[in-house]
């Protein structure tokens, strides 16, 4: 079976690796173009999928768009049986969707129709969902509206971070995709329509959302911290040894106590919220590495959280 793989971030890599490892012929990998990196933006960094595909000698294509006739002709010339799409980042026009003999199949990190869109992992945690999952669907022209081929549910534990859920769903996605490809080869892949009720959209995370609002209930603050960890990272300003510093918050738990929002309630960094309190467990100085709260506080006194 001739496969075109389309993906960009680290989340996509285990699925690509599994497809290669199970002997499928990956004739091309499509991924986002290299991005400027480094302090001055002078270096170009290739995507994780780009790096992995090159390790296996797979031709890599990095178009900025697939809307043009020339790019669509190149794609069609690959004569793919199927395209596998996992967090690619570009919209696929109808000409691309129709080119592979068996269609295009997408690995999506939610239980559709909940959390259609760009940031389903973060949004599920930020909303306080108790479960999510991984789905394989046959793509159509809508935004994550295609027929569902396979799904697996995953519990979201109370302190689970987006990073932990990301890794879990990525591995589940690899297993599901291999099972889906096998069923597709055997012509036994059953497709079901998504439910019409319960549609929500996982909008891309806005930078403004990363700043913690201590006037919100503790549960919402805790969900924001873990939903934005490790990237982009929730943050706040702290008064440390008399100076105000921006600090990233990577882990937290629900704490006990109350007070004016932003009040430091004890020497274990329990912070009062609009309702209840949150204990900060892992913090990160600007330009530093994540540290457990006890180590973060060594030689430092936090008097106020803004």
From Swiss-Prot:
GO MF entries: methionyl-tRNA formyltransferase activity
Residues given in the record as (6S)-5,6,7,8-tetrahydrofolate binding sites: 110-113
Catalytic activity: L-methionyl-tRNA(fMet) + (6R)-10-formyltetrahydrofolate = N-formyl-L-methionyl-tRNA(fMet) + (6S)-5,6,7,8-tetrahydrofolate + H(+)
InterPro entries: Fmt (IPR005794), Formyl_trans_C (IPR005793), Formyl_trans_C_sf (IPR037022), Formyl_transf_N (IPR002376), Formyl_transf_N_sf (IPR036477), Formyl_transferase-like_C_sf (IPR011034), GART_AS (IPR001555), Met-tRNA-FMT_C (IPR044135)
Cross-referenced Pfam families: Formyl_trans_C (PF02911), Formyl_trans_N (PF00551)
Top-level taxon of origin: Bacteria
EC number: 2.1.2.9
Keyword Protein biosynthesis listed: yes
Top enzyme class: transferase
GO cellular-component term (any): cytosol
Keywords from the UniProt entry: Protein biosynthesis, Transferase
Protein purpose: Attaches a formyl group to the free amino group of methionyl-tRNA(fMet). The formyl group appears to play a dual role in the initiator identity of N-formylmethionyl-tRNA by promoting its recognition by IF2 and preventing the misappropriation of this tRNA by the elongation apparatus.
Annotated family: Belongs to the Fmt family.
Protein name according to UniProt: Methionyl-tRNA formyltransferase
Organism: Brucella suis (strain ATCC 23445 / NCTC 10510)
This protein's encoding gene: fmt
